[in-house]
Amino acid sequence: MVLASRTTALAQRRKAARATGMSRPAFMTIIMAILALLTLSAFMSPASSAGGMGVAAAADKRSEYGTVIGIDLGTTYSCVGAQVNGRVEIITNDQGNRITPSYVAFTPWGESDLKKDAKHLPFKLVEKNGKPAIQVTVNGEKKVFTPEEVSAMVLQKMKETAEAYLGHKVTHAVVTVPAYFNDAQRQATKDAGTIAGLNVLRIVNEPTAAAIAYGLDKKDGESQIIVYDLGGGTFDVSLLSIDSGVFEVLATAGDTHLGGEDFDNRVSEYILKQFKKKTGLDASSNKRSVGKLKREVERAKRTLSSQMSTKIEIDGFFEGNDLDETLTRAKFEELNMDLFRKTMKPVEQVLKDAGVKKDEIDDVVLVGGSTRIPKVQAMLKEYFGREPSKGINPDEAVAWGAAVQGGVLAGDESLGDVVLIDVNPLTLGIETNGGVMTKLIPRNTVVPTKKSQIFSTAADNQNTVLIQVFEGERSMTKDNNLLGKFELTGIPPAPRGTPQIEVTFELDANGIMKVSAADKGTGKSESITISNDKGRLTPEEIERMVAEAEEFAEQDEAVRKRIEALNNLQNFIASLRSQLSDKEGLGGKLDKEDKETIKQSLKDAEAWLDENSQTAEGSDIEEQLSELQAAVAPITAKIYQGGAAAGGDDEPLNYGHDEL
């Protein structure tokens, strides 16, 4: 269905995008390890853009890049693919499988029987430079690895798998991440690629990559689709418009801590309780028993996608006792119903953000192994009134799309004009006077993007401004997440509001940001690239931010208006005092009586501020400003009526730019 609300501007944007066409790559697979597994918190990615290089220009990159592989770096499984001879190939690993578990095992040299060492290789989280890291035992020594290093091991295996199939070295890749990954997670994914010996040309949002797999060959006009991506550890929903090779993300939402592993954990907890009821034994703290149970629960979950019940049986489960439980599909759904329902909230959110009604959606595309759960499919069918699309392989679609993006970047002419237009998931801005979140790039803005805005100083002779960069949806920075900060120094002495400080945000196609500030008077500038710092948002915080932004919208607006009114009054007083002392301007054109009247009005206003600035409502502050303006207006009017300002040299009283 054609989007009724698409504008001429959108058409122009697409036309420009085609001229600089860009796309998404796909899969990489590799089985890595059996045993003593280190579960990888894998990153899934956003990233594409309307900007980029056209196919002709991209052809020049073929010799430079070689084959650009596409990797779906998943929480539980990873997959790799490449564009070969005009078609996408999903590459099998050395076990003959097209998807590879995202696990890493650390084993002694020459050890053939890995199972005997499993109990000696548990991992625990430790702190390393203020960030979480993984501690394991390798050859009797304790080793500490960052999440990026462990992810790099999986990426390295994917790289080797592709090289074995292609018969040549691979140096460039497109890697996918969840659409709701924040800046730190995206940067960490790029870092992992670098550690693995890969130049990550593009970080791509998983739903966008999957949309390519779904819509690359569709030529029947514009359509709007929902990509519902429920994997092993993360969940994303994106609403896209597809039109003749242009894939435009209109909105995205999700939860980077929701997926199949959560469903498994619910069942495992239930089975452990049942075992305790029967035997009186608590096996929940025994890692070996819990590990066995988890594997059986995952198998049972898969079975319940096609059968109504299954058995979970483990001989010698704990302290010589066998485990024997029956799990029905109904019980599985009961244990996880709240989580299933939780996945519908982001669906509603993207429809709301994009201004699209659910009956305007042409198709619902299922991605991720957990979308095979019958209850999930039934809920989507009930909500949209149609069967979800099952035309693509949910395990391979993301890698497939990533491989296509890799082909475009490598200059594969068989792909024609494939253009990706993606968005940023959270609003970005800086703190201005009073702790206000001044938004420069709203969420769901098309990336790459660049936005500049002029700010000024908050005090006379202020020679330094602090630029604090935040992400989030609330009106006050204290309720949002600090990404980074830096100072611009050496500002020449001047009255408040006089210097012009230009702050620029640049968000690249990978969703990674650079912020700069420049004094337009001196030309001096400073900048910061927001990277993988501690203190970045957790997935839960991201979800909470969006929810709280709606819940507290009215309250936030009242606080914002109050601070805005306070700034307006303070700026008016400062500006009026400055003009009153200017003998060449207003101060030199007033008689003594009028000047004293204005001075007294200023004194009264300042006294009121000293007493009430912390407690007054926004309306009270606005009233005080109106009273001050009313006292001054008749006096300044006399000057103009008398022709004293005929030259028009006086600047009108104004509030200036937002203050830093």
From Swiss-Prot:
Chief site of localization? endoplasmic reticulum
Instruction: State the GO CC annotations.
Output: cytoplasm; endoplasmic reticulum chaperone complex; endoplasmic reticulum lumen; membrane; nucleus
List the signal peptide residues. none
| Residue span of motif Prevents secretion from ER | 657-660
**Entries under Gene3D superfamilies matching the protein:** 1.20.1270.10, 3.30.30.30, 3.30.420.40, Actin, Chain A, domain 4, Substrate Binding Domain Of DNAk, Chain A, domain 1
PROSITE patterns to which the protein is assigned, alphabetical: ER_TARGET (PS00014), HSP70_1 (PS00297), HSP70_2 (PS00329), HSP70_3 (PS01036)
Q: Which domain of life is it from?
A: Eukaryota
One annotated GO biological process: ERAD pathway
- Could you tell me the EC number(s) of this protein? 3.6.4.10
**Name of the protein this chain belongs to:** Endoplasmic reticulum chaperone BIP1
